Design a protein with these regions (language model features):
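Glycine-centered loop/turn motifs
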Residues: 1-4, 103
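Cysteine/selenocysteine-centered motifs that mediate thiol-based redox chemistry or coordinate metal-sulfur cofactors
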Residues: 2, 8-37, 44-46, 135-161
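CN hydrolase (nitrilase-like) catalytic-core segments centered on the catalytic cysteine
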Residues: 16, 25-125
Length: 161
């Protein structure tokens, strides 16, 4: 895997969205910058195969899916709430080399609640309904901190000894 050199924010079919991969979900800044540039949605393609001690030689994808769904929900819920946007996760499915991928999809609303899930450990598709009204409401809520960011303070912290 190689790191990218840009953060795409795309407008298509009336929606503005950010795009990221796997490890990007651990960086709140990526979601924040996309939201500041108008993103209402964020899509993340994941290639997570679980921790080594949790991967069974039989390729038990259901066990891996359970682990990944729990971890991703913690991260993605916060990203959605902070930025007032929908977030969608899709993980690779099946075997690649010696690794098994759990094949799950998650759809998280701007309030951080799960609105759709496919986590059977098998290939599948997730279909859910989204609305701009929910995004507009979320972006004006107290939980959404996109407009409360203070880069003037973050750039020059006061070090107290």
């Amino acid at each position: 895997f190689h790191s990218g050199s840009s953060l795409p924010v795309v407008t298509s079919q009336g929606w503005t969205f950010g795009v990221g991969i796997c490890f990007d979900v651990r960086f709140p800044e990526i979601f924040r910058v996309a939201a500041q540039h108008g993103a209402e949605l964020f899509f993340v393609a994941v290639g997570g195969s679980g921790h080594v001690d949790q991967i069974k030689p039989s390729g038990d994808q259901k066990h891996q899916a359970k682990f990944h769904v729990k971890e991703m929900m913690q991260l993605v819920s916060a990203r959605s709430i902070d930025n007032g946007m929908y977030t969608f996760i899709a993980n690779q499915s099946g075997k690649s080399g010696n690794a098994w991928f759990p094949g799950y999809c998650l759809a998280v609303a701007p309030n951080g609640k799960l609105i759709g899930e496919h986590s059977t450990g098998e290939e599948g598709m997730l279909i859910t309904e989204i609305t701009k009204q929910i995004v507009k409401k979320a972006k004006t809520s107290a939980e959404c901190t996109v407009t409360a960011v203070r880069p003037d303070i973050y750039a020059n912290p006061v070090i107290v000894e």
